């Protein structure tokens, strides 16, 4: 969120509970509980949603925000979203839901929650670079940060959906 704050107005609309492997699942029966959330960062509008990551995007774009955002950031997922794993990912599902609303999206993942040195250093510059590019109409960006130290970091691999064994 701190990295996004330097890019413009930030809204956080996130699941109230862990939602791993939810894919693009949405809630079609029943109500979703949406609560304002006191996010520990200045100038951030935040809500928790009792639903899936894709539900969060639907609620944000369809109910909470008066204007479409320029971009949706999804994640940060703990664990890579590569190869077939992207089919199961709630992080990817949320980015795909943004695409359904006509909003460009970037899904972010990192190897492990406690391996964030490269992510903390490169998230903002990578996001800025991707935002400056024209994304084809029916595509999202899927960014996976390695779980290594800055000394071990070998640079950015720009690729289409990479194979799981590439990591």
Protein language model features and the residues they cover:
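Electrostatically charged, flexible surface regions
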Residues: 120-167
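Short beta-strand segments
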Residues: 13-15, 74-77, 108-109, 143-146
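A cross-family phosphate/adenosyl-ligand binding-site feature
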Residues: 3-56, 60-63, 67-68
């Amino acid at each position: 969120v701190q990295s996004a704050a330097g890019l413009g107005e930030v809204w956080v609309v996130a699941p109230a509970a862990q939602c791993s492997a939810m894919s693009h699942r949405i809630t079609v029966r029943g109500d979703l509980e949406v609560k304002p959330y006191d996010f520990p960062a200045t100038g951030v509008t935040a809500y928790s949603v009792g639903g899936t990551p894709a539900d969060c995007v639907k609620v944000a774009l369809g109910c909470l925000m008066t204007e479409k955002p320029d971009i949706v950031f999804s994640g940060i997922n703990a664990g890579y979203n590569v190869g077939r794993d992207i089919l199961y990912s709630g992080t990817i599902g949320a980015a795909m839901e943004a695409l359904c609303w006509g909003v460009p999206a970037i899904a972010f993942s990192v190897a492990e929650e406690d391996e964030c040195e490269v992510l903390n250093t490169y998230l903002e510059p990578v996001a800025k670079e991707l935002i400056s590019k024209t994304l084809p109409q029916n595509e999202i960006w899927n960014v996976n940060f390695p779980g290594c130290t800055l000394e071990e970091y070998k640079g950015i691999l720009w690729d289409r959906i990479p194979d799981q064994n590439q990591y």
